[in-house]
Regions:
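Alpha-helical promoter-recognition and RNA polymerase-docking modules of transcription initiation factors
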Residues: 2-120
Length: 120
């Protein structure tokens, strides 16, 4: 029973990774445009900016493996940080979104590790 649950989780993670591999980073101009639309409450812009950066969250999450949480849990925490960054990003400051978002992604992962991770 436990092995089956683990396999289902691994299959779900594999499917998720397969789905997001086609996402491409956005040009800075597009990020700025989306940030303005997000500030105006455009949910589609919020989704587009987030989806374009899901693969980056996975790459950051992989750096924190073997610290007490599964890769899926790390990705989930990183995605929460990504959404905070999406909501707070100001494209007028001239920064690339990912340079801003990486701090929120790492912070969310570190918080999850502190709260839920276990010492090895």
């Amino acid at each position: 029973m436990l092995a089956q649950t683990r396999l289902e989780k691994e299959d779900a993670l594999a499917q998720y990774l397969k789905e997001i591999t086609s996402s491409k980073p956005l040009p800075r101009e597009r990020e700025t445009e989306l940030a303005e639309r997000i500030q105006a409450g455009d949910e589609a812009a919020r989704q587009e900016l987030a989806e374009a950066n899901l693969l980056f969250v996975v790459s950051v999450a992989k750096q924190y493996q073997n610290r007490g949480l599964t890769l899926a849990e790390l990705i989930s925490a990183g995605n929460l940080g990504l959404m905070i960054a999406v909501d707070r990003f100001d494209g007028q400051l001239g920064n690339k979104f990912i340079s801003y978002a990486v701090w929120w992604i790492r912070q969310a992962i570190m918080k999850a590790l502190a709260e839920d991770g276990r010492l090895v």
